[in-house]
C-alpha cells in the first residue's frame, strides 16, 4: 500500500477505511465548495465593477502576476478569463482588502455555536460581551471556507480532530485588522460532522433556491 500512499499520508488516518470515508466525504462536499467559490468570485466582480468599473481586473495590483502568467501562455486576456483563473485565496483576500465581507454574505441568522459547542458568538471588549457583527461573522466564515477548501483539495483528513478533542478546522480572529480592541482572541472551529452543515448554511444565506439545488448534487 505504501507504493500508492506514503507512510505520512497513511499516518493521518486511523485506518484504511477512514481514508476511504474521507475521500467519499470530500467528493460529497466538493459541489458545495465549488459553487460557493463561483458565487464569491461573481459577487466580488459585481461589487468591484460597481466601485471601480469593469476594467478593475486589469488595474488590480494583486492580479498582475496572474495576468503575466496568462500572457506567457499566449492566451487572449479577457475580464472573464482573469476572473475564472483567480484562486479562492485571491478572491477572499480582495474581499478582505475592500471590506466587502458583510456585503457579500449575510450571516446574521446563523450562530457559530452550531458547529462546535465551545464556539462563542460574542466578543469580549473591555470586559463587556458584544454580539458579533455580520461583517466579523462573514470574515471568520470565509477563512473557515478557505481552510476547508484547501484541506479537501489536498486530500487531507477532514474527519480527524486534535488530540485535545478540539476541531482541526479552526480560525482565529483578533480584531486587529478591524481595529477592534478585543480582550482576547476569538477562535472558531468546526467539528468534522458539522462541516456539511456549515457549508449548507453559507449556501442558504445567499437565499437562491436554484443555487441550493445545484449545490446538493
Where are these regions (language model features)?
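Acidic/aromatic/glycine-rich contiguous surface patches that form carbohydrate-binding/processing clefts
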Residues: 155
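Extended intrinsically disordered or low-complexity regions, especially N/C-terminal cytosolic tails and loops
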Residues: 1-148, 159-217
Amino acid at each position: 500500500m505504501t507504493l500508492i500512499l506514503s507512510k505520512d499520508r497513511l499516518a493521518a488516518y486511523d485506518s484504511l477505511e477512514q481514508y476511504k470515508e474521507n475521500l467519499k466525504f470530500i467528493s460529497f462536499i466538493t459541489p458545495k465548495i465549488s459553487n460557493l467559490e463561483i458565487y464569491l468570485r461573481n459577487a466580488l466582480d459585481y461589487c468591484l465593477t460597481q466601485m471601480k468599473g469593469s476594467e478593475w481586473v486589469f488595474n488590480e495590483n494583486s492580479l498582475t502576476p496572474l495576468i503575466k502568467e496568462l500572457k506567457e501562455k499566449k492566451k487572449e486576456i479577457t475580464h472573464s478569463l482573469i476572473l475564472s483563473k483567480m484562486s479562492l485565496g485571491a478572491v477572499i483576500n480582495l474581499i478582505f482588502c475592500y471590506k466587502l465581507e458583510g456585503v457579500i454574505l449575510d450571516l446574521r441568522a446563523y450562530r457559530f455555536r452550531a458547529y462546535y459547542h465551545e464556539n462563542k458568538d460574542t466578543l469580549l471588549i473591555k470586559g463587556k460581551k458584544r454580539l458579533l457583527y455580520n461583517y466579523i461573522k462573514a470574515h471568520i466564515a470565509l477563512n473557515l471556507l478557505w481552510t476547508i477548501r484547501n484541506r479537501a483539495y489536498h486530500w487531507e483528513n477532514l474527519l480527524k480532530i486534535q488530540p485535545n478533542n478540539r476541531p482541526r478546522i479552526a480560525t482565529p480572529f483578533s480584531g486587529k485588522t478591524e481595529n477592534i480592541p478585543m480582550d482576547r482572541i476569538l477562535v472558531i472551529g468546526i467539528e468534522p460532522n458539522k462541516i456539511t452543515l456549515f457549508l449548507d448554511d453559507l449556501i442558504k444565506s445567499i437565499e437562491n433556491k436554484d443555487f441550493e439545488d445545484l449545490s446538493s448534487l
